[in-house]
Amino acid sequence: METARIRLDETTYYSLLGLPFGASELHIRKAYMRLARELHPDKSKSKEAAELFKVVAHAHSVLTDKEKRLKYDRQLIAKGLHTYVSNSSSSLNYKPPGSRPVTRAQQAAVAADKERAAKKAKPYEEQPYGFGTEAESSPQAGDGTPQRSTTATKPFKAKSYQHQRNPGTPPETGNKKSSTFSARFISNSVPAAPESKPSDEYPAKKMPRKQATPEPSSSPFLSPDHRHYARTKFESRRRGTRSASPLKTMPTSQTDTLDGLKSIINKFSDRVKVNIFGSPSTVETEHVTDLSEDQSSVEQDGGDEARLRADMLAGDKATARCAPIPQDGTKEINLEELNTSLPPQRETFNMRNVSDTLDRMNVKRQKLNTEATHVPGNIPLPAQRHLSPALDESGSLAEPVNKSIPRVYKIDRIPPTEFAMDLSVSDIELPTMPSFHCNILDKSDIKLCREKILEFNTKANRLKKQLIQALSLRSSADEALENRVVRVENMAAYVEAKNYDLDVVMKLHEIQNRQRIVAESFTNLMRSAYASGTF
C-alpha cells in the first residue's frame, strides 16, 4: 500500500489508530503493528510517513500506559469526544468479534445438522427401542468405498414381544380384563391342532387340588395373622412393664414409717450398750426377745392390712392418725407435731424456704465439748467407733464434732461518701469563648479583645484546678478501697465511680480545647494587626 493513500484521522488517538473509544489493549496493539509496518521509515522513504509514524507511536504509548490512558479518557469525556467515530478508511480495520463473516463450510454444517435432527414420524408401536435398534448404514451415491454387507436382523420390539403369546395355551375364561393384543402382531408360527384332551386335565404336569372339607378349629383367632398380632402385642406389653418391688406393694403410712424407724434406732443403741457393758447371755436373750417382737409386729401388720389400704386411698383428702405404740425406756413421739412439721404427701418440696431459713441464721463457732467426746482407754477400737451416738444422745446434729463450721460470707458495703465523688462537678458551666469581631485598625478594639481573652483564661484555669483536685481525691479513694471495691456488693458503686471520673475528664478536655481555639484565633488577629501597620 502506498503512503499517499494513507489518510489518518487525528481527531483522537483512538481514531488515529482506527479504533473506537474504549478499545481493548489487544486491538490497540494490532492496529499499531499494522500501521507501523506501513509507516516505519525502514519500510517507507517519504517524510510524511515518518511524521505519521511518530504520531502513531505517541498515540500507542499513551493508550498502552494505564495512567496516561485514564487521564486522556477523562479529557475526551470532558470535551464530548468519547462518542466520536471516525468515517475514514482506517476505522474499517476494526471489526468486533460478532461481525465476522460466515463461511460456506459453516453454512453447510448448520444445514446438515438441521437435516439430521429431523426424524420421520412413525406410530408408537413401530418406533424402535431396546436392543438391536441400530440402523444399517446404506451406501451413498458419491462414495466410492464399498460398504460391508451384513445380514439384516430383526430388531427387538418390546410391544410386539409383549403381545406374542403361546397359541397352545388357552386363555383363562374367568379373566375379564381388557387386553392390548392386536391383530397387527400375529405370530408367524403355525397354530397347533386342537387336542382332544378333556379340560379337566389342563394344565399339564400338575396335580389337581384336593378340596378338603373345612374342619372346625379350636383356636379363638380367625387367622394366623390375628394370632401373630395378639402374641406380639402381649410380648411388647410384658416387656414394657417394670418389676414391682415388695416394698411398694406393701401399704404404709406416715405413722408406721416413723414408728418402725424409731424401733430400729432403739435396737441398735441397745445392742451397742450390751456389747460394751453387758454379757453374752444377756445379748442372746435380748436377741430372742427382738425376734419375738419382730414376729408380733409382722402379725400385727398382717392383721391391719385392710386398715392400711383404706388409709392409702384416703391419703389425698386427710392424713391418717394412729396412736403410737408405747415402749418402755424410750421417749414418746408426738405424731401430730411431726405431721404439722413434715411436708404433705404428693406435694413438691420447696427448697427456697430452706435456703431463706439458713440465710437468716447467725451461725457461730462453738467450742468442742471435750468431756462428752472422752472415751475410756479400756474400750476396744471397734467399740469406740460406735460409741459416740450411744453416749451422747442429747447432742444435736448441728454441733460440730471434728470439723470446723465454715465461715459465713459477711457483706461489706462501701458508702458513697468513701468514694470521694463531688456531685457538684456535673453542674459546672464551662466558660464561653469570646468573640473576635473587632477592627484590626483600631487599637482600642484590639485592647478590648485582649481583656476578654484574659478574663476567659482566668475562669478556665480556676475550673481546671477544681477538676484536677476532684480527680486527685478520686485516685486517693481508689487506692484506699483497692481490696473492697472488687467485692460483689460493691461492683455497681465501683462502676458508677468510674463513670464520674470519665465525666470529670471530659469536662477538663473541653476546657483545654476551648483555650486552644481562643489562643489560635487571637494569634491570627494579632498577625493581621501587625501586618496592617496598626502597631
From Swiss-Prot:
GO cellular component: endoplasmic reticulum membrane; nucleus
Keywords (A to Z) from UniProt: Chaperone, Coiled coil, Cytoplasm, Nucleus
Regions annotated as coiled coil: 446-499
Residue intervals of the J domain: 12-76
GO molecular function term, any single one: Hsp70 protein binding
Biased composition, class Basic and acidic residues, residue ranges: 112-125, 224-238
Signal peptide per UniProt: none
Subcellular location(s) of the protein: Cytoplasm; Nucleus
Organism in which the protein naturally occurs: Eremothecium gossypii (strain ATCC 10895 / CBS 109.51 / FGSC 9923 / NRRL Y-1056) (Yeast)
Annotated GO biological process: cellular response to misfolded protein; chaperone cofactor-dependent protein refolding
SMART domains with a match to the protein in the record: DnaJ
Name of protein: J protein JJJ2
InterPro entries in UniProt: DnaJ_domain (IPR001623), DnaJ_domain_CS (IPR018253), DnaJ_subfamily_B/C (IPR051100), J_dom_sf (IPR036869)
Major location category of this protein: cytoplasm
Location of region: Disordered: 87-256, 284-303
One matching Pfam family: DnaJ
PANTHER family named in the record: AT29763P-RELATED
Biased composition (Polar residues): 135-153, 176-190, 242-256
Lineage: Eukaryota, Fungi, Dikarya, Ascomycota, Saccharomycotina
